[in-house]
From Swiss-Prot:
PANTHER family: CHROMOSOME TRANSMISSION FIDELITY FACTOR 18 (PTHR23389), REPLICATION FACTOR C SUBUNIT 1 (PTHR23389:SF6). Part of the RFC clamp loader complex which loads the PCNA sliding clamp onto DNA. GO terms for molecular function: ATP binding; ATP hydrolysis activity; DNA clamp loader activity. Belongs to the activator 1 small subunits family. RfcL subfamily. It comes from Methanocaldococcus jannaschii (strain ATCC 43067 / DSM 2661 / JAL-1 / JCM 10045 / NBRC 100440). This is Replication factor C large subunit. The gene is rfcL.
Length: 516
């Protein structure tokens, strides 16, 4: 049993709800193929349920083309695309029919399973002789960015609520449902432009047997979160105040982020210089209110900023531009991402300066600028400051660049070397000084002062006198007299002996006398 979505899928373009201008473009495009021309493939971009695939099949049916489809459920890697799409792009069916190739949800071609898919698809497009229609929810998906130059992008908007209601009304009549218009309109409102979801919801209520208005109210709200590209498209395409101001309602971004997106893409969309000038005048005013939000922490200013950056910019142009514009990611965000590491390093330096100088980050930032200036004008002084603030090599390179950093570090290295040398010399002198002091102290312990010498000599003399008195006592008179008599006797005796020897010497010594 077919679902109602498939059962009531339009077989012809005239039965497709809405998208009148898109249908005309598709007719012109397919007819150029029938004339032997080979225009660029079409990329239909729009939210889920807006009728992208239905349009492709209805177009093929109207012009007698056989559809070759490759959707998200199929493998779409390099070999699969080459095998299926590559062959169909350059040949016809056995019945002589031409092929219309439909690649559904090409923005989902990514990951290992689909490796090389987009690259192979570009090769196929370059050689294709048959028409190719691609569909995507998001034309700005990174996975298909390289594909955009080779296709013509056609933007589809969500199906209008009235168009959804009309389709539901027809289905209800064909199915014989007893349902009032109020309930059908509620289902249409809940769909948020997703016709497929609306048909599924009606079928679910019919199967449940409850087609009341209350049951329709309980249906899940299918409002999708709009991405920033959807919001940009609304703001930059419309000239209606009310539509522009509601463009950001479902966007999960703060005004300070949105303003960067708008500023980046205004010059891409607006063609007249005066329009661009007016738009940036409104953006400038919006930015002032955002500044007040930051300074005063008063978020009520956001509503003024939002109105200026949406309605103000939208009404700056003289006319709507029907062209498709490839909107860009803000360069400032790419730059901030690129310089994130550098900014973290600068914040570290600011913290070091603040801690050393006991100042605020604002004042430290001023000191940082002075340090950068000194690095150019007086690298020697800058080297001292780098040392004082304990700034590392990688931090210095971010601050002043590699060349200046190398020069300052070289100076600092020489200064450090000189300091170490001076320190060693100082330590050496201190050691020698201490050595001399110790030697003097030792010598001073050996040398006695004059007063001490006098006292010691006196004490020594007294000591010697005492010893002398004990050893050498004065002799008595009798002992002296007796000693002199003894000496006289010894003297006389010695004289007699000497006389006798003299006489003996003069006599002849005989043998008898010799032996006697």
């Amino acid at each position: 049993m077919l679902s109602w979505v498939e059962k009531y899928r339009p077989k012809s373009l005239k039965d497709v709800a809405g998208h009148e201008k898109v249908k005309e473009k598709l007719k012109t495009w397919i007819e150029s193929y029938l004339k032997g021309e080979t225009p660029k493939p079409i990329l239909l971009v729009g939210p889920p349920g807006c009728g992208k695939t239905t349009l492709a099949y209805a177009l093929a049916n109207d012009y007698g083309f056989e559809v070759i489809e490759l959707n998200a459920s199929d493998k779409r890697n390099s070999s699969a695309i080459k095998k299926v799409v590559g062959h169909a792009a350059t040949s016809s069916s056995i019945f002589g029919k031409k092929f219309l190739i439909v690649l559904d949800e090409v923005d989902g071609i990514s990951g290992k399973e689909d490796a090389g898919g987009v690259s192979e698809l570009i090769k196929v497009i370059k050689k294709a002789k048959n028409p190719i229609i691609l569909t995507a929810n998001d034309a700005y998906a990174p996975s298909i960015r390289s594909l955009l130059p080779y296709v013509e992008v056609i933007q589809l908007n969500p199906v209008h609520t009235n168009s959804v209601y009309k389709v539901l009304k027809k289905i209800a009549e064909k199915e014989g449902l007893d349902v009032d218009d109020k309930t059908l309109k509620m289902i249409a409102q809940h769909s948020a432009g997703d016709l497929r979801s609306a048909i599924n919801d009606l079928e679910a209520l019919a199967l449940s047997g409850d087609l009341s208005y209350e049951a329709a109210q309980k249906l899940p709200d299918r409002k999708r979160e709009a991405n920033i590209f959807d919001a940009l498209r609304v703001i930059l395409k419309t000239t209606h105040y009310g539509i522009a101001t509601t463009a950001l309602m479902n966007v999960d971004e703060t005004p300070d982020v949105v303003i960067e997106w708008i500023a980046e893409n205004v010059p891409k969309e607006y063609e007249k210089p005066e329009e661009v000038a007016r738009a940036f005048e409104y953006l400038s005013k919006a930015d002032r209110y955002l500044g007040r939000v930051m300074r005063r922490q008063n978020y009520s200013f956001w509503k003024y900023a939002t109105t200026l950056m949406t309605a103000g910019v939208a009404l700056s142009k003289d006319e709507k531009y029907r062209k498709w514009t490839p909107y860009s990611y803000p360069k400032i965000f790419r730059l901030l991402t690129k310089t994130k590491a550098e900014r973290e390093i600068l914040n570290k330096i600011l913290k070091k300066i603040g801690e050393k100088t006991h100042t605020s980050s604002k004042r430290a930032r001023f000191d940082l600028q002075m340090l950068k200036l000194l690095a150019k004008e007086n690298p020697s002084v800058a080297a001292d400051l780098v040392d004082y603030f304990e700034i590392k090599e990688d931090e210095l390179k971010v601050l002043v660049g590699d060349k200046l950093a190398s020069e300052i570090l070289k100076i600092l290295k020489e200064k450090k070397k000189l300091e170490r040398k001076k320190k060693k010399e100082k330590e050496k002198l201190e050691k020698e000084k201490k050595k001399e002091e110790k030697a003097k102290e030792k010598q001073s312990n050996l040398i006695i002062q004059p007063k001490e010498i006098k006292e010691e000599v006196k004490a020594e003399v007294e000591k010697k006198e005492e010893v002398k008195e004990k050893i050498v006592e004065k002799p008595k008179a009798e002992e002296v007299k007796e000693k002199s008599k003894t000496e006289e006797k010894e003297t006389k005796k010695d004289k007699k002996k000497g006389k006798k020897k003299k006489e003996d010497k003069g006599k002849q010594l005989t043998l008898d006398a010799f032996f006697k």
